[in-house]
Protein backbone atom coordinates (compact mmCIF):
# COMPACT_ATOMS: atom_id res chain seq x y z
CA UNK A 1 0.00 0.00 0.00
CA UNK A 2 1.06 3.58 -0.60
CA UNK A 3 1.41 5.89 2.42
CA UNK A 4 -1.92 7.48 1.58
CA UNK A 5 -3.65 4.11 1.28
CA UNK A 6 -2.10 2.94 4.56
CA UNK A 7 -3.29 5.99 6.47
CA UNK A 8 -6.85 5.74 5.14
CA UNK A 9 -7.08 1.97 5.62
CA UNK A 10 -5.75 2.10 9.19
CA UNK A 11 -8.15 4.90 10.07
CA UNK A 12 -11.10 2.85 8.83
CA UNK A 13 -9.85 -0.28 10.61
CA UNK A 14 -9.60 1.47 13.98
CA UNK A 15 -12.97 3.16 13.48
CA UNK A 16 -14.73 -0.11 12.63
CA UNK A 17 -13.16 -1.84 15.64
CA UNK A 18 -14.07 0.88 18.12
CA UNK A 19 -17.55 1.80 16.89
CA UNK A 20 -19.43 -1.13 18.51
CA UNK A 21 -18.06 -0.08 21.90
CA UNK A 22 -19.25 3.55 21.84
CA UNK A 23 -21.24 4.30 24.96
CA UNK A 24 -20.68 0.79 26.40
CA UNK A 25 -20.21 0.52 30.15
CA UNK A 26 -16.92 -1.41 29.89
CA UNK A 27 -15.39 1.42 27.89
CA UNK A 28 -15.75 3.73 30.89
CA UNK A 29 -13.44 1.71 33.13
CA UNK A 30 -10.16 3.51 33.84
CA UNK A 31 -7.47 0.95 33.07
CA UNK A 32 -4.30 2.94 33.64
CA UNK A 33 -2.29 5.99 32.66
CA UNK A 34 -1.11 6.74 29.13
CA UNK A 35 2.48 7.60 28.20
CA UNK A 36 1.26 11.21 28.01
CA UNK A 37 -0.03 11.14 31.59
CA UNK A 38 -3.70 11.20 30.59
CA UNK A 39 -6.13 8.60 31.91
CA UNK A 40 -6.53 5.41 29.85
CA UNK A 41 -10.02 3.97 29.53
CA UNK A 42 -11.10 0.50 28.45
CA UNK A 43 -12.12 1.75 25.02
CA UNK A 44 -8.60 3.11 24.50
CA UNK A 45 -7.15 -0.38 24.94
CA UNK A 46 -9.52 -1.76 22.30
CA UNK A 47 -8.34 0.94 19.89
CA UNK A 48 -4.66 0.26 20.61
CA UNK A 49 -5.13 -3.45 19.89
CA UNK A 50 -6.63 -2.52 16.53
CA UNK A 51 -3.45 -0.65 15.57
CA UNK A 52 -1.20 -3.62 16.25
CA UNK A 53 -3.51 -6.09 14.49
CA UNK A 54 -3.52 -3.92 11.35
CA UNK A 55 0.26 -3.47 11.25
CA UNK A 56 0.87 -7.19 11.77
CA UNK A 57 -1.76 -8.19 9.21
CA UNK A 58 -0.32 -5.89 6.55
CA UNK A 59 3.29 -6.82 7.51
CA UNK A 60 4.31 -3.15 7.63
CA UNK A 61 7.89 -2.12 8.37
CA UNK A 62 6.94 0.94 10.30
CA UNK A 63 7.03 2.67 13.66
CA UNK A 64 4.04 4.12 15.39
CA UNK A 65 3.59 6.57 18.22
CA UNK A 66 0.37 6.70 20.17
CA UNK A 67 -1.02 8.32 23.27
CA UNK A 68 -1.11 5.14 25.32
CA UNK A 69 1.95 3.17 24.17
CA UNK A 70 4.49 5.78 23.14
CA UNK A 71 6.90 4.70 20.34
CA UNK A 72 6.83 1.12 19.04
CA UNK A 73 8.81 -0.19 16.05
CA UNK A 74 7.83 -2.98 13.66
CA UNK A 75 10.55 -4.35 11.39
CA UNK A 76 14.32 -3.90 11.38
CA UNK A 77 14.35 -0.55 9.58
CA UNK A 78 11.01 1.28 9.78
CA UNK A 79 10.52 3.53 6.76
CA UNK A 80 8.05 5.88 8.39
CA UNK A 81 6.35 6.70 11.64
CA UNK A 82 2.61 6.84 12.14
CA UNK A 83 1.43 9.35 14.73
CA UNK A 84 -1.83 7.92 15.98
CA UNK A 85 -4.51 9.02 18.37
CA UNK A 86 -6.82 6.03 18.02
CA UNK A 87 -9.58 7.91 19.82
CA UNK A 88 -9.31 11.68 20.01
CA UNK A 89 -12.30 12.42 22.18
CA UNK A 90 -12.24 9.40 24.48
CA UNK A 91 -14.63 11.05 26.93
CA UNK A 92 -17.27 11.75 24.26
CA UNK A 93 -16.71 8.22 22.92
CA UNK A 94 -17.44 6.52 26.22
CA UNK A 95 -20.60 8.63 26.45
CA UNK A 96 -21.63 7.64 22.91
CA UNK A 97 -21.46 11.19 21.52
CA UNK A 98 -20.41 12.13 17.99
CA UNK A 99 -17.39 14.25 18.96
CA UNK A 100 -14.82 11.46 18.72
CA UNK A 101 -12.50 10.62 15.85
CA UNK A 102 -9.59 8.42 14.79
CA UNK A 103 -6.46 10.42 13.93
CA UNK A 104 -3.61 8.96 11.85
CA UNK A 105 -0.66 10.93 10.46
CA UNK A 106 2.31 9.72 8.38
CA UNK A 107 5.81 11.20 8.54
CA UNK A 108 9.22 9.97 7.42
CA UNK A 109 10.99 8.29 10.33
CA UNK A 110 13.82 10.57 11.41
CA UNK A 111 15.28 11.95 14.63
CA UNK A 112 13.40 14.97 15.98
CA UNK A 113 10.58 14.61 13.44
CA UNK A 114 8.16 17.53 13.77
CA UNK A 115 4.60 18.50 12.95
CA UNK A 116 5.90 20.22 9.83
CA UNK A 117 7.23 16.86 8.59
CA UNK A 118 3.80 15.21 8.45
CA UNK A 119 3.15 14.19 4.84
CA UNK A 120 -0.31 12.63 5.09
CA UNK A 121 -3.09 12.86 7.63
CA UNK A 122 -6.50 11.29 8.02
CA UNK A 123 -9.33 11.88 10.48
CA UNK A 124 -12.23 9.43 10.60
CA UNK A 125 -15.47 10.05 12.46
CA UNK A 126 -16.12 7.06 14.73
CA UNK A 127 -19.87 7.34 15.14
CA UNK A 128 -20.45 8.41 11.54
CA UNK A 129 -18.66 7.56 8.28
CA UNK A 130 -17.15 10.84 7.10
CA UNK A 131 -13.39 10.88 6.46
CA UNK A 132 -11.08 13.87 6.15
CA UNK A 133 -7.61 13.50 4.69
CA UNK A 134 -4.83 15.64 3.26
CA UNK A 135 -1.43 15.39 1.63
CA UNK A 136 0.98 18.21 2.36
CA UNK A 137 0.83 20.65 -0.54
CA UNK A 138 -1.99 18.69 -2.15
CA UNK A 139 -5.07 20.12 -0.47
CA UNK A 140 -7.63 18.54 1.84
CA UNK A 141 -10.45 16.14 1.02
CA UNK A 142 -13.75 15.41 2.74
CA UNK A 143 -15.23 12.01 1.90
CA UNK A 144 -18.87 11.37 2.72
CA UNK A 145 -20.51 8.11 3.85
CA UNK A 146 -21.26 7.07 0.26
CA UNK A 147 -17.64 7.56 -0.82
CA UNK A 148 -18.29 10.79 -2.70
CA UNK A 149 -16.21 13.89 -2.11
CA UNK A 150 -17.82 16.88 -0.40
CA UNK A 151 -16.88 20.52 -0.79
CA UNK A 152 -15.17 22.25 2.14
CA UNK A 153 -17.32 25.03 3.56
CA UNK A 154 -15.10 27.30 5.63
CA UNK A 155 -17.21 30.00 7.24
CA UNK A 156 -16.47 33.58 6.11
CA UNK A 157 -17.59 34.94 9.52
CA UNK A 158 -15.21 37.67 10.69
CA UNK A 159 -16.98 38.88 13.84
CA UNK A 160 -16.45 37.09 17.14
CA UNK A 161 -20.07 37.76 18.08
CA UNK A 162 -21.26 35.64 15.14
CA UNK A 163 -18.61 32.92 15.34
CA UNK A 164 -19.51 29.41 16.55
CA UNK A 165 -16.47 28.14 18.44
CA UNK A 166 -15.09 25.52 20.80
CA UNK A 167 -12.62 25.65 23.65
CA UNK A 168 -10.87 23.04 25.80
CA UNK A 169 -10.95 22.56 29.58
CA UNK A 170 -9.71 19.04 30.45
CA UNK A 171 -7.19 19.43 33.32
CA UNK A 172 -6.95 23.17 32.57
CA UNK A 173 -7.83 25.44 35.53
CA UNK A 174 -11.29 26.67 34.59
CA UNK A 175 -11.11 29.58 37.02
CA UNK A 176 -8.34 30.99 34.78
CA UNK A 177 -9.72 29.76 31.46
CA UNK A 178 -12.94 31.63 32.25
CA UNK A 179 -11.13 34.92 32.77
CA UNK A 180 -8.88 34.56 29.73
CA UNK A 181 -11.75 33.55 27.41
CA UNK A 182 -14.45 35.63 29.09
CA UNK A 183 -14.57 38.39 26.48
CA UNK A 184 -14.75 35.86 23.63
CA UNK A 185 -17.39 33.65 25.24
CA UNK A 186 -19.53 36.61 26.28
CA UNK A 187 -19.44 37.91 22.71
CA UNK A 188 -20.10 34.58 20.97
CA UNK A 189 -22.44 32.66 23.24
CA UNK A 190 -25.75 34.25 22.19
CA UNK A 191 -25.35 34.93 18.48
CA UNK A 192 -22.49 32.61 17.54
CA UNK A 193 -22.38 29.66 19.91
CA UNK A 194 -19.81 28.22 22.33
CA UNK A 195 -19.28 24.47 22.53
CA UNK A 196 -17.16 22.04 24.52
CA UNK A 197 -16.32 18.84 22.63
CA UNK A 198 -13.19 17.52 24.41
CA UNK A 199 -11.66 16.70 21.00
CA UNK A 200 -9.40 19.15 19.21
CA UNK A 201 -9.14 16.93 16.13
CA UNK A 202 -12.93 16.76 15.82
CA UNK A 203 -13.17 20.52 16.31
CA UNK A 204 -10.59 21.25 13.60
CA UNK A 205 -12.53 19.15 11.08
CA UNK A 206 -15.63 21.19 11.90
CA UNK A 207 -13.86 24.20 10.39
CA UNK A 208 -13.86 22.27 7.11
CA UNK A 209 -17.54 21.30 7.39
CA UNK A 210 -18.64 24.86 8.14
CA UNK A 211 -20.07 23.96 11.54
CA UNK A 212 -17.47 25.97 13.46
CA UNK A 213 -15.53 29.15 12.83
CA UNK A 214 -12.89 28.64 15.53
CA UNK A 215 -11.36 26.24 18.03
CA UNK A 216 -9.27 27.40 20.98
CA UNK A 217 -7.05 25.74 23.57
CA UNK A 218 -5.11 28.22 25.71
CA UNK A 219 -4.15 25.84 28.51
CA UNK A 220 -0.46 25.70 27.67
CA UNK A 221 -0.28 29.45 27.10
CA UNK A 222 -1.44 29.95 30.68
CA UNK A 223 1.03 27.33 31.91
CA UNK A 224 3.88 29.13 30.15
CA UNK A 225 2.85 32.69 30.93
CA UNK A 226 2.18 32.05 34.61
CA UNK A 227 4.78 29.63 36.06
CA UNK A 228 3.42 30.37 39.54
CA UNK A 229 0.26 28.51 38.57
CA UNK A 230 2.02 25.26 37.63
CA UNK A 231 1.02 23.53 40.87
CA UNK A 232 -2.63 24.00 39.93
CA UNK A 233 -2.01 22.24 36.59
CA UNK A 234 -0.20 19.45 38.44
CA UNK A 235 -3.15 18.99 40.78
CA UNK A 236 -5.68 18.77 37.95
CA UNK A 237 -3.45 16.40 35.94
CA UNK A 238 -2.85 14.11 38.94
CA UNK A 239 0.82 14.99 39.15
CA UNK A 240 1.56 15.99 35.55
CA UNK A 241 0.43 18.96 33.46
CA UNK A 242 -2.02 17.81 30.79
CA UNK A 243 -2.50 19.82 27.63
CA UNK A 244 -2.50 19.68 23.86
CA UNK A 245 -0.12 16.98 22.63
CA UNK A 246 1.37 16.64 19.15
CA UNK A 247 -0.55 13.42 18.48
CA UNK A 248 -3.83 15.29 19.12
CA UNK A 249 -3.29 17.53 16.10
CA UNK A 250 -0.74 15.71 13.90
CA UNK A 251 -3.36 14.89 11.26
CA UNK A 252 -6.02 17.50 11.98
CA UNK A 253 -3.73 20.54 11.81
CA UNK A 254 -2.49 19.46 8.37
CA UNK A 255 -6.01 18.78 7.13
CA UNK A 256 -7.41 22.09 8.39
CA UNK A 257 -4.48 24.07 7.00
CA UNK A 258 -4.69 22.36 3.61
CA UNK A 259 -8.42 23.14 3.57
CA UNK A 260 -7.61 26.85 3.93
CA UNK A 261 -8.03 27.36 7.67
CA UNK A 262 -5.61 29.43 9.75
CA UNK A 263 -3.97 27.27 12.43
CA UNK A 264 -1.37 28.53 14.93
CA UNK A 265 -0.64 28.26 18.62
CA UNK A 266 -2.42 30.63 21.02
CA UNK A 267 0.34 33.21 20.55
CA UNK A 268 -0.15 33.27 16.77
CA UNK A 269 3.04 31.28 16.06
CA UNK A 270 3.49 28.32 13.72
CA UNK A 271 3.10 24.83 15.16
CA UNK A 272 5.38 23.23 12.55
CA UNK A 273 8.34 22.92 14.92
CA UNK A 274 6.41 20.86 17.46
CA UNK A 275 8.20 17.53 18.07
CA UNK A 276 5.97 14.61 17.19
CA UNK A 277 7.52 11.98 19.47
CA UNK A 278 7.61 14.00 22.67
CA UNK A 279 4.87 14.21 25.30
CA UNK A 280 7.04 16.06 27.80
CA UNK A 281 5.84 19.23 29.43
CA UNK A 282 8.09 21.55 27.33
CA UNK A 283 6.44 20.17 24.17
CA UNK A 284 2.84 20.84 25.23
CA UNK A 285 1.05 23.19 22.86
CA UNK A 286 -1.84 25.60 22.62
CA UNK A 287 -3.93 26.21 19.51
CA UNK A 288 -6.03 28.80 17.75
CA UNK A 289 -7.65 27.49 14.58
CA UNK A 290 -10.06 29.62 12.56
CA UNK A 291 -11.93 29.50 9.28
CA UNK A 292 -10.32 32.72 8.04
CA UNK A 293 -7.37 34.98 8.92
CA UNK A 294 -9.44 38.05 9.85
CA UNK A 295 -11.29 36.18 12.59
CA UNK A 296 -7.98 34.68 13.71
CA UNK A 297 -6.48 38.14 14.21
CA UNK A 298 -9.50 39.37 16.17
CA UNK A 299 -9.55 36.31 18.41
CA UNK A 300 -5.82 36.58 19.03
CA UNK A 301 -6.23 40.20 20.10
CA UNK A 302 -9.07 39.20 22.43
CA UNK A 303 -6.94 36.38 23.86
CA UNK A 304 -4.11 38.80 24.55
CA UNK A 305 -6.52 41.08 26.42
CA UNK A 306 -8.00 38.16 28.34
CA UNK A 307 -4.64 36.78 29.42
CA UNK A 308 -3.67 40.31 30.42
CA UNK A 309 -6.55 40.35 32.92
CA UNK A 310 -5.11 37.38 34.79
CA UNK A 311 -2.90 37.81 37.82
CA UNK A 312 -1.79 34.37 38.93
CA UNK A 313 0.45 34.08 41.96
CA UNK A 314 1.26 31.22 44.30
CA UNK A 315 -1.60 32.39 46.52
CA UNK A 316 -4.03 31.70 43.62
CA UNK A 317 -3.13 28.03 43.44
Regions found by a protein language model. Name each.
Residues 1-87, 270-271, 300, 309-317:
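N-terminal subdomain of lithium-sensitive/metallo-dependent phosphomonoesterases centered on the IMPase/IPPase/PAP
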Residues 14, 18, 128, 135-138, ...:
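An extended, acidic
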Residues 44, 89-90, 207, 256:
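Buried hydrophobic positions in well-ordered alpha/beta secondary-structure cores of metabolic enzymes
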Residues 52, 140-145:
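Acidic, Mg2+-coordinating active-site environments of NTP-dependent enzymes
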Residues 60-66, 111-119, 142:
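Short secondary-structure capping/junction motifs at helix and strand boundaries
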Residues 62-63, 80-82, 101, 120-122, ...:
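Structural motif
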Residues 63-67, 93, 195-198, 216:
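General beta-strand structural signal in soluble alpha/beta enzymes
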Residues 77-138:
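DPxDG-like acidic metal-binding loop motif
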